[in-house]
Amino acid sequence: MKMIISPAKQMVSDDEPLVRPTPIRFPAQVTELMADLKSRTPAELQELWRCSDKLARENVARVQAFDLKRVGTPAVFAYAGIQYQSLGAGVLTDRGLQNLGQRLYILSGLYGLLGAFDGILPYRLEMGAKGEIAGAKNLYQYWGARLYQALFASGDLVVNLASKEYSKAITPYLTPADRWVTVLFKQEKNGRLVQQATAAKKARGSLVRYLALENEPTLATIKAFTVGGYRYRADLSTEAEYVFVKD
């Protein structure tokens, strides 16, 4: 079983991580994309990022300092958003960390597909960024089928916990033979079931943690997840989409 999640905008660096960083999969592509970013003016970068002046200054400095020769922080420790706080990789057991390293993958606009412990440097480049980049219409076109091919090379079941922005880098290439299950976390609001972004991020992180602590997780293991008051709803689910509803 593999799990895929989205990255986070918030990032930190750790010079003494719990695990040794592993090599990234696409160094040539990262170099090409970063060369494009380095060629842009601060104003052009801010337009690409669609962020505040403060965030633009911080990330322009990151672009200028970016050098793949530097040792990066393992990805699951480098991202610091709600999902990653809920996952809590820093307080997993040794076996949990080992399982995480074997099963968790993170989709990234800059790095493409990351293993949990792949060493990365702070950056800002969302998969859904608007406009041409590195000779492509957008990042979806730039990465093409490469991320799908890397993810499904072993034929494993893939549990999709990524946002639509990121899973869209994979879904156009899925075939009927691929084993792919999307997990949705919903709650009732004004008489309707909706997926609230912050709550869903927290639940995704909790599910990743829960599965990392299982030695041989199956689809039945996923259905048994109840952290945070969520329950699997068979009546709302299909073979390709598991729906959980908060009590």
Curated annotation (Swiss-Prot):
Source organism per UniProt: Limosilactobacillus fermentum (strain NBRC 3956 / LMG 18251) (Lactobacillus fermentum)
NCBIfam families in UniProt: PRK02101.1-4
Protein name per UniProt: UPF0246 protein LAF_1150
Family: Belongs to the UPF0246 family.
Matching InterPro entries: YaaA
GO CC annotations, alphabetized: cytosol
HAMAP family membership: UPF0246 (MF_00652)
GO biological process: response to hydroperoxide
